[in-house]
């Protein structure tokens, strides 16, 4: 199964950029979890709803100036068992259609941490961790993702916004945090805001 399909919303279009690289190239190592903060007193009911992906950074994400990544949205829907139904909606420009990636995030060992539900249904995927780094719930959030696929470790940080634009201060903070985890500038992108598919 192609890497792009395995990402299933972790990197979405960013994964396609990664496929263009030499598949034998070395990935930037994932940081120890001790370097990744966890939002204190995480409020799962306040976190749910639609988030726009304002920033993306990761060891399989590369900035493409000629074909910049388009913004997509992710909707978190809290279920009675405290897991989330998570739907990412993106616009496929060539096909001129909306794509939907649906998965379940199951509560992990502490509030604000999650694993992927039904992980065995994703071939080659052996672990998947989601950690909410910080959020104020009504404006912005930073979320860390780490997975092991085909025995390779991938990680990503997403900057979410309740709106398509965030302050330069929040973006700078996102860049600083991404760099603190070992990612250089060309592995940090700010998707271009669009209207197709992600509004409504």
Where do the PLM segments sit?
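A beta-rich soluble binding module of mature secreted/lumenal proteins
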Residues: 1-200
């Amino acid at each position: 199964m192609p890497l792009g399909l395995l990402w299933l919303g972790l990197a979405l279009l960013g994964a396609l950029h990664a496929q263009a690289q030499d598949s034998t190239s070395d990935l930037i190592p994932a940081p120890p979890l001790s370097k990744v903060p966890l939002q204190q007193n995480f409020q799962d009911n306040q976190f749910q709803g639609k988030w726009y992906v304002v920033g993306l950074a990761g060891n399989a994400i590369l900035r493409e100036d000629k074909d910049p990544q388009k913004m997509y949205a992710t909707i978190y829907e809290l279920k009675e068992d405290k897991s989330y139904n998570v739907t990412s909606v993106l616009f496929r420009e060539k096909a001129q259609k909306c794509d939907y990636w649906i998965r379940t995030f199951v509560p992990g060992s502490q509030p604000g941490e999650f694993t992927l539900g039904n992980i065995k249904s994703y071939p080659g995927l052996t672990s998947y961790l989601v950690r909410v780094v910080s959020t104020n719930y009504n404006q912005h959030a930073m979320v860390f993702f780490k997975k092991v696929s085909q025995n390779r470790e991938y990680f990503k940080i997403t900057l979410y916004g309740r709106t398509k634009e965030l302050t330069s201060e929040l973006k700078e903070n996102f860049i600083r945090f991404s760099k603190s985890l070992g990612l250089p500038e060309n592995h940090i992108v700010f998707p271009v805001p669009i209207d197709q598919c992600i509004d409504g």
